[in-house]
C-alpha cells in the first residue's frame, strides 16, 4: 500500500476548506461567548475510565484504546468531549452556581457514525451546569439555533424528544442492558415488529406504550396523541408538558416531535433535541439534558448541552468565494518591503511571487498586483 494512503474515513483538509472550517470555528466560539460561555480545552488523551463514565456501550465501542507507557493504565482517545467537560466542571472549577462552558476540538471514532462520515470530527459544543429548570434547556437550544444562524445555515428544523418517556415506560420492568439497547435501537428505527418481539414478556401497559411510541412523531398533534396513547404517569405528563413549552418558545423555527428518538449516547436523562437542515443526511446538531453525567466525579448536578461537527457543517454550506489578494514581485528593495508590510497591516493578503515560479494557491484570487510607478509602489488591477 502506498505511504500516502490514509485510513478509511480519515482525510486531509485542504487549504480552502481548512480556512472555511477555521472561520466557522471562530464564529461558533464567538457566538457562545456572547451568551457567556467560557472556553475550555480538555486533552485529546485521557484515562479510559474518565472518558467512558456513565456513557454506555455506544461510546465504549467508539473509543480508540491504548496502554500508557508511563503508568501501564488503559487510556483512550476521546470520542466525545462531554464527559471531559463534566469532569472540569465537577472537579477543577467546582463552582457553586451556574457554569457555562464551551469547547472545540477533534474527537476520534473507531467507526464512522454514518456511511460518509469522518472518523475524526471537529466537535464544537456548549454546556450549562447547575440549573435544573427548563430555562437552561431553552437557552442551550436557542444558542444552538443562533450558532447555525450565524454561519448562515438556511431554514433549520428542530426535532424534540424526551428520554424520560421511555425510562418511565420501562420503570419496574426487569430489563438487562443488552435488551434495553436492542429496544432503543428498534425504537430509533421505528421497527414495530422487532419491538413487539423484544417486549413480548413485558407487562401489557409498558408494552403497549413502547409500541405506541413508534407512531408518535410529527407536528404538535403528536403531543395530544401521546396524552391519549401513553400511561398518565407523572414523568410522562411532565415530559409532554415540557416539550410543549419548549416548542412554544421557539418563534419562527420549524418544530417537530419524535418521542421514540433515543439516538446518541446513553447519558441523556431528559429533554433532547436534534437540528436538521437542507443538504444534510443526518442531524447537524444533537443535544439535551444529561443531569447525571458528573456524578462519578463527585458532583451530580443538572447539566444540558449540545454538540456538532464543524466539518459536517461545512458540507451543507455554499462554497466560499475566493479571498481577493494582491500579487507582489520578490525583490530586495527596501521600499517594496515597506509597501508590502503596510498593505498587510491594513488586512490585505499579499502573495509574493518567488523568482522562477508562478503563484499557485487554492484559497486566494489575485485580482491586483503591486507595481512600481513614478518611484513608488502602487496597487493596480490585473
UniProtKB/Swiss-Prot annotation:
A GO biological-process term: L-histidine biosynthetic process
Subcellular location: Cytoplasm
Pfam families documented for this protein: tRNA-synt_His
Entry annotated with the keyword Lipid metabolism: no
Signal peptide: none
Pathway entry: Amino-acid biosynthesis; L-histidine biosynthesis; L-histidine from 5-phospho-alpha-D-ribose 1-diphosphate: step 1/9
InterPro entries: aa-tRNA-synth_II/BPL/LPL, HisRS-like_core, HisRS/HisZ, HisZ
GO molecular function, one term: histidine-tRNA ligase activity
Regions that span the bilayer: none
CC terms in the record's Gene Ontology section: cytoplasm
The entry's keywords: Amino-acid biosynthesis, Cytoplasm, Histidine biosynthesis
NCBIfam families linked: hisZ_biosyn_reg, PRK12292.1-1, PRK12421.1
Further facts: This function is generally fulfilled by the C-terminal part of HisG, which is missing in some bacteria such as this one.
Homology family: Belongs to the class-II aminoacyl-tRNA synthetase family. HisZ subfamily.
Stored PANTHER family: HISTIDINE--TRNA LIGASE, MITOCHONDRIAL-RELATED (PTHR43707:SF1), HISTIDYL-TRNA SYNTHETASE (PTHR43707)
Function in brief: Required for the first step of histidine biosynthesis. May allow the feedback regulation of ATP phosphoribosyltransferase activity by histidine.
Record note on quaternary structure: Heteromultimer composed of HisG and HisZ subunits.
Protein name: ATP phosphoribosyltransferase regulatory subunit
Species this chain originates from: Albidiferax ferrireducens (strain ATCC BAA-621 / DSM 15236 / T118) (Rhodoferax ferrireducens)
